[in-house]
Swiss-Prot record:
The gene is cho2. Keywords: Endoplasmic reticulum, Lipid biosynthesis, Lipid metabolism, Membrane, Methyltransferase, Phospholipid biosynthesis, Phospholipid metabolism, S-adenosyl-L-methionine, Transferase, Transmembrane, Transmembrane helix. Residues 107-109, 217-223, 299-300, 412-417, 495-496, 597-971 are cytoplasmic. This is Phosphatidylethanolamine N-methyltransferase. It comes from Aspergillus oryzae (strain ATCC 42149 / RIB 40). Pathway: Phospholipid metabolism; phosphatidylcholine biosynthesis. GO terms for cellular component: cortical endoplasmic reticulum; endoplasmic reticulum membrane; perinuclear endoplasmic reticulum. Pfam families: PEMT. Residues 1-30, 330-359, 699-723 are annotated as: Disordered.
Length: 971
């Protein structure tokens, strides 16, 4: 329902992202993308509404008739009514009657259960349907299989009564521009789906309101003023919520309100305004303000907590269902550039300024640093637990420092003296994080002081950048760790949670902390590591400014939302000392933005800076002219105040500089002196009449190179075992390439079940030859199309049910058989080495009818060569087919030549890089992180890195066959 995209949207005509993201690739949505999400309002030149045209996945174009929102359809007397409306209204009336009939003590628990049921039906039920529709077109396939939309006159519809019911219901609701028989099946399916949505959403809202009524009461000893304030705030929030919903529906219309783009797309020009300029995902963020307003009016913590649960479930729905569909539908990776399409600069990028491919001078002088003004590729990022690397001094220091702070906080008493020390420590670190770090960035912006220091000692700008990231990271960690320690010392556990506003303060405080965490994550997702660490202070980035993510709505989210958690701590502790720290933090953060960030942005981008963000513009539009003038006057006062402060600082700067220089010299001299999953196997009972001899599987694949066979005789065997293998037959071992597609030919009786399927398993996973007892984990393909309600299991079907006449069979059998072919590739393969088999299963169950010959997937170990140039070329030659297989041989991802760049999907989906590093490790004995593959970008760069790594590791290798990572080598 919340179809206003808030991330990865490019707004080129408005300029700024308050910190430029030079090294991060930005996904750009086409107008069709925003159109399809429903942020549209099509008008002709005269301002009148025009017809809307829809487009189904198969390219069918149709007229989308005008429809109305659910409330109007149900309650407006001017709208036509049908049986489904009566059913919905009857169910809503039953809810109200139940509240009236239940005894007082049962109302709250009963309606809590009812509301949670409808909320689960919304987020889990509708979410499951939409997820499957997005990935497998399940709802449309159900309609196709049941043929409920096929005219019974054709004789193909086994459910004529259902057809007549749907036809009457839908044509009653849409009297103009709609014909049930002529509309595409996707559109009819969507119309039926939205009737289900109407029922669930209306029951969800009504049951919530009834639950709030059941819980509502007047608090004991509450003053009249507090009651008036509570109800006034609640009413304001509800009215604001109502405006958000109405304005959102005005913008997105019914198409996006009912998730129409899961079924079809519409062709329209777009407008992007209203509530979608105010907040990301307004339907799911600020669109739930009314829940908290109702909680205030009900004066019930039960209503508040169930509102929080509902809000959290809605965000889970957004993250798990809507966002993946948006990315898949509207953010496809850009097409990969071929070698012929690349510019000369791209082809010759591996020159002296490349950290990957060395020049001959670099070969002669191995320690000569390379200098580049371009931002470095981020391979080993700092932020996030998943990037924690204890081999890195920055991460080790961070962990040790946090452990030390935690230990001191827990082990010391909470006496006034220790409380003062911890608060003072937090204040000092906040001063350092804002003023100290700000001073260094100011010097870097104006004089490149930080970079000059490292260049002075022969280091590269990249080294200066890495050291800066470590310094900033440690400063940030100490700032917040010391603040948390001070909060811990000042916090007193409540003796009575029901006293006064204690519980409310904790709930609001936790909410503000969560808001700051979400804001920080959103900022990092928008800026990337380069922007997070102020990379445009160190490298010349792009002069083009873009707004995406949270910056579409706010110029500086750090200004308010970025410190919400600090004020949450104030609410939780109710401490004057923590209030002082919060004020100090906020003032210093505002000063940092005003005196450090803004001047640098103005110097880099000048007039292209955006003055008002989306939220500010929306608020200004809603203000009367007099208040707009007042807003301008206030802005002028603030600007003049900041200019006055800047003049004072400029006057005092020489004295401060002398003092700082003396302090630095003295300090320098001083330092120089000192789950388990359960799988249930379903056994079919109708196997009678099927002969397993009529079933067979034949496997074909790309044979592995001869390098894989060299390990069969390693010298570790006995004398007899070293002899050539004596085969009593003409069948050789099946050894296939890693990641190469595998073709499976099957035979079965003519009357085999259309729901038969073939799965891929490790040989050691199944002890039974009759029943498969482990999950295929998605590695299966149906033998016939249309048998299952998803499309994934049909990917790989080549042909099905080709009849083999009795005279065509080689084994003398006189029965006709059916045959077919499927191809296992990509995610349907095991991306590891081992011995595997295919199993043919009967009728969507796990009864095994045939098992293929076992086959081995093996990665051949690379043989060393002495000459470096030959090694470089041969490594490239060996890597290219492996990498193509790792990239599913997709022409949009996999390179055709060693100098072609990888497709952009390699950066977005980490599985491809992980496949490559596993293969490289097995082939060459060198272990890389997946980010290395993404950063290298071509087979040639990766081959050079492999050769260089092997030369570096050669002195430490204990392998007689060449360099490898010693501790990882397994014999």
């Amino acid at each position: 329902m919340d179809r206003g995209l808030s991330t990865s949207t490019r707004i080129d005509d408005e300029g700024l992202r308050e910190r430029n993201v030079a090294s991060q690739s930005t996904s750009t949505l086409s107008p069709e993308a925003l159109t399809a999400t429903g942020d549209v309002e099509l008008k002709d030149k005269t301002g009148k509404d025009c017809k809307t045209f829809g487009r189904t996945p198969d390219g069918t174009v149709f007229t989308v008739p005008q429809t109305h929102d659910m409330v109007s359809q149900l309650l407006s007397p001017s709208e036509p009514k049908n049986l489904s409306d009566v059913i919905v209204l009857a169910i809503l009336g039953a809810h109200i009657l139940l509240l009236w009939q239940l005894p007082t003590g049962a109302k709250v628990p009963v309606f809590a259960i009812i509301y949670l049921f409808w909320r689960a039906a919304y987020n889990a039920g509708i979410g499951w349907l939409l997820h499957n529709q997005s990935h497998h077109k399940t709802l449309v396939r159900w309609a196709e299989k049941t043929k409920v939309f096929v005219n019974p006159a054709t004789g193909k519809n086994p459910h004529p009564n259902v057809y007549n019911f749907f036809k009457r219901e839908l044509e009653t609701k849409i009297p103009h521009d709609y014909s049930f028989d002529e509309a595409p099946i996707e559109y009819n399916t969507w119309l039926v789906f939205r009737r289900l949505v109407d029922l669930i959403l209306m029951c969800d809202f009504v049951s919530y309101c009834l639950f709030a009524i059941a819980c509502s009461h007047h608090p004991v000893n509450e003053s009249v003023l507090m009651t008036v304030l509570r109800w006034s705030a609640g009413i304001v929030l509800v009215l604001f919520n109502l405006w958000v919903k109405l304005d959102a529906h005005r913008v997105v219309k019914d198409f996006a309100w009912y998730w129409g783009d899961f079924f079809y797309l519409i062709d329209q020009e777009l407008t992007f305004d209203g509530v979608f300029e105010m907040a990301p995902h307004p339907m799911y963020s600020v669109g739930y303000a009314g829940y908290y307003g109702i909680s205030l009016m009900a004066a019930s913590y039960k209503v508040l907590f169930i509102s929080i649960i509902a809000h959290a479930a809605q965000f889970a729905f957004l993250v798990l269902v809507e966002n993946p569909h948006i990315d898949k539908t509207y953010n496809p990776p850009p097409s990969r550039k071929r070698s012929a399409e690349q510019e000369t600069g791209s082809v010759s990028s591996r020159t002296a300024d490349s950290p990957i491919a060395p020049t001959p001078i670099d070969e002669q002088i191995p320690h000569a640093p390379t200098f580049s003004s371009s931002p470095p590729q981020s391979v080993h990022e700092l932020l996030g637990l998943h990037n924690l690397d204890l081999y890195r001094i920055t991460d080790t220091s961070s962990v040790l420092i946090q452990f030390l702070v935690f230990a001191l906080t827990v082990l010391t008493p909470s006496t006034p003296w220790y409380q003062f020390l911890f608060v003072a420590n937090a204040a000092v670190w906040r001063l350092w994080f804002s003023i100290g770090v700000g001073y260094m960035l100011h010097r870097q912006s104006n004089h490149k002081a930080w970079t000059r220091h490292f260049v002075k000692y022969g280091e590269t700008p990249q080294e200066a950048w890495n050291q800066w990231k470590g310094t900033y990271h440690l400063s940030m960690i100490m700032c917040y760790a010391s603040f948390i320690a001070a909060v811990w010392k000042m916090y007193n556990f409540p003796a009575d949670w029901g006293y006064g506003l204690v519980l409310l303060r904790h709930v609001l405080g936790a909410g503000l902390i969560s808001l700051q965490i979400w804001t920080s994550v959103s900022i990092y997702e928008s800026l990337g590591e380069f922007g997070w660490f102020y990379g445009d202070f160190f490298f010349d980035g792009s002069s083009k400014l873009t707004y995406n993510g949270i910056y579409r709505f706010l110029n500086n989210p750090e200004r308010v939302l970025g410190l919400a958690g600090v004020w949450g701590a104030v609410l939780i502790t109710s401490s004057g000392a923590i209030t002082f720290l919060a004020l100090l933090s906020h003032i210093l953060s505002l000063a940092f933005i005003q005196f450090i960030e803004r001047p640098h942005m103005q110097k880099l981008y000048g007039q292209s800076l955006r003055q008002d963000a989306g939220l500010v513009k929306s608020l200004k539009k809603s203000l009367p002219p007099t208040l707009r003038q007042l807003h301008g006057s206030v802005d002028k006062i603030f600007d003049e105040s900041f200019e006055f402060i800047e003049e004072i600082i400029e006057t005092a700067r020489p004295k401060l500089a002398n003092g700082v220089n003396t302090f630095v010299k003295d300090t320098t001299a001083l330092f120089q002196s000192y789950p388990a999953r359960v799988t249930i196997s379903r056994i079919d009972e109708d196997l009678a009449g099927y002969d397993s001899r009529d079933y067979s599987l034949e496997v074909e694949g790309t044979d592995s190179s001869s390098l894989a066979e060299h390990d069969q005789s390693t010298g570790r065997e006995g004398a007899n075992a070293r002899m050539p293998l004596d085969r009593r037959g003409d069948l050789k071992n099946l050894v296939f390439e890693y990641g190469a597609p595998i073709r499976v030919k099957w035979t079965a009786p003519l009357n085999h079940s259309k729901k038969d399927w073939i799965g891929l398993y490790k040989v050691t996973d199944n002890t039974s030859r009759e029943v498969t007892r482990v999950s295929s984990q998605g590695r299966w393909i149906a033998v016939n199309e249309g048998a299952y309600d998803n499309l994934t299991c049909e990917k790989g079907i080549v042909k099905s049910d080709v009849v083999i006449k009795a005279t065509q069979q080689q084994d003398g059998d006189k029965r006709d058989l059916a045959t077919g072919e499927v191809i296992f590739s990509g995610d349907k393969l095991f991306w590891t080495q081992g011995v595997f088999e295919f199993r043919y299963h009967h009728n969507a169950k796990h009864n095994v009818m045939a098992i293929s010959r076992p086959f081995e997937i093996r990665i051949g170990r690379y043989e060393e060569e002495d000459d470096h140039e030959l090694t470089q070329a041969s490594v490239e030659k060996s890597l290219l087919p492996v990498i193509r297989s790792c990239f599913d041989r997709d022409p949009e991802i996999a390179p055709e030549a060693v100098d072609e760049p990888f497709g952009s999907l390699v950066e977005r989906d980490g599985k491809f890089a992980k496949r490559v590093v596993f293969a490289v490790h097995q082939m060459f004995g060198v272990e890389f992180a997946p980010g290395v593959v993404q950063a290298d970008g071509t087979v040639r760069n990766l081959a050079w890195r492999v050769c260089n790594a092997k030369r570096v590791l050669a002195p430490y290798s204990m392998s007689r066959n060449g360099a490898s990572t010693p501790t990882e080598r397994k014999e």
